[in-house]
């Protein structure tokens, strides 16, 4: 009898150990709200489904809602205690800090071996966070906000030199009427670039520069994602843009466009966070884990984004999408090779978001005709 009891206890202990060693069960569904382009987000979700099946034995049904960052944040606030998505992904970290402070996100633990590969910050003289020290969000990939330009239009038709700095946009009168941009109150990415200028030059000189930029602007498009399209078609020579918001896709489709991130350009770590009271928190955690694996990071590399892990870089066989991305970016392969200038202050940007938008509407957008006459 004792021998039988010992045998039963041993079997129970072995079963318990097996269960504890097995991966935690995840929900069979995952919903994401994101400004990240479908070129990236759909591929990531499809790859995650394969990864989740192999690791957890679960067929995860995924869906995503494509929204600009500001619209996504607004929806999350509207949803309140009944969110219609599990994850918010992409955009500017300052908006994630605001959501966290207002109680719309939950802290989550990323596997230590993956989290430790990501540096706390990047850039000088103002270090830019790549992961939230409080644990509400973590960066997934690096993407600069900068200038997209039509190389043929700039060099052959206008006989101008492609821009390398912010100053170059306004230094050549040939660019007057050749710039496209979205207003900062309609685009969080454009708002971030406005803040880069304001923090670089100071409030008064920054607005003077932005006023001249408005005078040189041929069109204020409805969305930031529209800028690469009008530049690719040759309707305008250059404009503020985010690579994954159609710029790199247009390049892959044969458009004669290139991208430059001027010194001090904002670089988003494409943050990701779990929404409080979401329906599928374990699937959400698993998706974040997947994006930080080598497999997830390579997915970004193959779509023109930079890895958030220093030991990885954008490279691939000749003619690969990764190598085409290097051409598109003017030779850059990593944001961890060499010095990255950053003066963008998250706290300052957060504290005056409404003030910046109000100033733009009242002193620039409402006075466009006068500014065009002045400059």
Q: For each of these PLM feature ranges, what is it?
A:
Residues 179-182, 290-311:
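Periplasmic-binding protein-like
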Residues 83-88, 106-151, 178:
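A structural signal for short loop-to-beta-strand junctions that line the ligand-binding cleft
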């Amino acid at each position: 009898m004792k021998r039988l009891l010992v045998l039963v206890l041993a079997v129970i202990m072995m079963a318990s150990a097996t269960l504890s060693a097995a991966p935690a069960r995840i929900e069979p569904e995952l919903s994401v709200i994101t400004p990240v382009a479908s070129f990236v987000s759909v591929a990531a979700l499809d790859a995650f489904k394969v990864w989740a099946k192999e690791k957890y034995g679960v067929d995860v049904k995924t869906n995503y809602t494509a929204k600009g960052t500001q619209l996504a944040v607004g929806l999350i606030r509207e949803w309140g205690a009944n969110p219609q998505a599990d994850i918010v992904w992409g955009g500017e970290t300052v908006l994630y800090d605001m959501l966290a402070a207002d109680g719309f996100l939950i802290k989550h633990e990323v596997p230590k071996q993956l989290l430790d590969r990501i540096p706390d910050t990047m850039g000088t003289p103002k270090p830019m966070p790549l992961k939230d020290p409080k644990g509400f969000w973590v960066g997934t990939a690096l993407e600069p906000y900068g200038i997209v330009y039509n190389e043929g239009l700039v060099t052959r038709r206008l006989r101008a030199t492609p821009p390398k700095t912010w100053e170059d946009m306004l230094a050549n009168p040939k660019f007057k009427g050749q710039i496209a941009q979205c207003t900062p109150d309609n685009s969080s990415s454009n708002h971030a670039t406005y803040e880069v200028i304001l923090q670089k030059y100071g409030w008064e000189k920054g607005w003077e520069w932005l006023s001249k930029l408005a005078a040189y602007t041929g069109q204020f498009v409805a969305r930031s994602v529209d800028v690469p399209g009008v530049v690719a078609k040759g309707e305008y020579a250059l404009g503020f843009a985010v690579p994954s918001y159609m710029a790199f896709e247009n390049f892959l489709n044969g458009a004669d466009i290139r991208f430059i991130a001027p010194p001090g350009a904002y670089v988003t770590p494409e943050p990701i966070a779990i929404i409080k009271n979401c329906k599928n928190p374990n699937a959400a955690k698993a998706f974040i884990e997947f994006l930080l694996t080598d497999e997830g990071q390579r997915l970004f590399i193959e779509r023109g984004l930079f890895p958030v892990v220093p030991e990885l870089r954008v490279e691939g066989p000749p003619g690969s999408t990764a190598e085409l991305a290097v051409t598109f970016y003017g030779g850059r392969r990593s944001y961890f090779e060499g010095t990255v200038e950053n003066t963008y202050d998250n706290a300052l940007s957060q504290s005056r978001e409404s003030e910046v938008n109000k100033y733009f509407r009242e002193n620039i957008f409402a006075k466009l005709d006068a500014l065009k006459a002045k400059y």
